[in-house]
Regions:
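Bacterial N-terminal signal peptides
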Residues: 12-23
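Extracytoplasmic copper-binding redox domains, predominantly the cupredoxin/blue-copper superfamily
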Residues: 25-141
Length: 141
């Protein structure tokens, strides 16, 4: 067998091995969540009567939000908030304290490292119904 054929075969094997290793190390696809923070002080997810989010521990999450202006807003132009709190003690989860401006926005986040029940709350006084702007958020092991 000639030296060039050996080199080609070796190259093909190395390339196949690199592709296999790349697949094994590749990140799983992100969990995409599309929701609306609406003018009636409600979070809404298409197809769900009661909005609820379920993710896995440490999962990458792409949050696509359409925010519609309510009756009031912050001086910085934020019209709604999206903050994740632990349900058991109402402490905020780092990285999940978002201020929403009018229109469409996208956030790349990492799901909490602790499984359990959480709650999403609006942190901008958006209307008289602001206190009812919340939804369940579950993190699975």
């Amino acid at each position: 067998m000639s030296g060039s054929r050996v080199a080609v075969r070796l190259f093909v094997r190395l390339l196949a091995g690199a592709l296999l290793v790349g697949k094994l190390w590749a990140q799983p696809p992100a969990h995409v969540i599309e929701l609306t923070a609406d003018r009636d002080s409600r979070y809404k997810i298409a197809g769900l009567r009661t909005p609820e989010i379920t993710v896995k521990v440490g999962e990458q999450v792409i949050l696509r939000v359409t925010a519609n202006r309510g009756k009031s807003w912050n001086r910085d132009g934020s019209i709604h908030g999206f903050s994740l709190l632990r349900a058991k003690d109402r402490t905020r989860v780092d990285g999940w304290d978002l201020l929403l401006k009018p229109g469409k926005q996208e956030f790349t986040l990492t799901a909490p490292s602790e499984p359990g029940e959480y709650v999403v709350v609006c942190t901008v006084i958006c209307s008289e119904e602001h206190e009812s702007m919340h939804m369940k958020f579950t993190v699975l092991p």
